């Protein structure tokens, strides 16, 4: 969605990688701090509510807002766009896997090692990374992709809330 405005230069890809790595760290920090300061029960209640927040925001779309900034300060514009369109959902999703592992571990004293959830999460991420450019991107227009994302995210949010 940003490539038509900025192109596919290495600086665009590097900036996006930087943003997503930083957002991943923010998600992990939120998980760690929340569990440490709030405990499992309060953190589960907070996250079960927070996971719904991205669905209340407007759909993800890159507009020409700030197009003048894009030509003068493309990196600043790109960081603004990714932060405002995918920042919150990404941070929430990044924090969900470690939280689910902790919830699983503390839900039952007889619970076994929760790290199989981490492996399942990585396998799902890899499958999505492979499927998107081969199936979704060429076959579905952007608006349908966004609709599928919102429906899928709603299902994930409901399942996470049920776990919390």
Please give the residue ranges for each predicted region.
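Alpha-helical transmembrane segments of multi-pass membrane proteins
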Residues: 1-164
């Amino acid at each position: 969605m940003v490539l038509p405005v900025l192109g596919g230069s290495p600086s665009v890809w590097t900036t996006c990688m930087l943003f997503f790595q930083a957002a991943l760290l923010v998600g992990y920090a939120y998980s760690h701090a929340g569990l440490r300061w709030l405990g499992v029960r309060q953190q589960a209640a907070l996250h079960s509510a927070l996971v719904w927040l991205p669905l209340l925001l407007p759909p993800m779309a890159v507009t020409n807002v700030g197009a003048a900034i894009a030509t003068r300060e493309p990196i600043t514009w790109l960081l603004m766009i990714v932060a405002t369109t995918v920042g919150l959902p990404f941070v929430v999703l990044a924090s969900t896997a470690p939280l689910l592992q902790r919830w699983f571990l503390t839900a039952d004293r007889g619970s076994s090692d929760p790290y199989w959830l981490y492996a399942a999460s990585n396998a799902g991420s890899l499958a999505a990374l492979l499927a998107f450019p081969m199936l979704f991107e060429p076959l579905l227009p952007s608006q349908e992709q966004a609709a599928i994302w919102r429906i899928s995210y709603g299902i994930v949010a409901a399942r996470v809330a049920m776990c919390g």
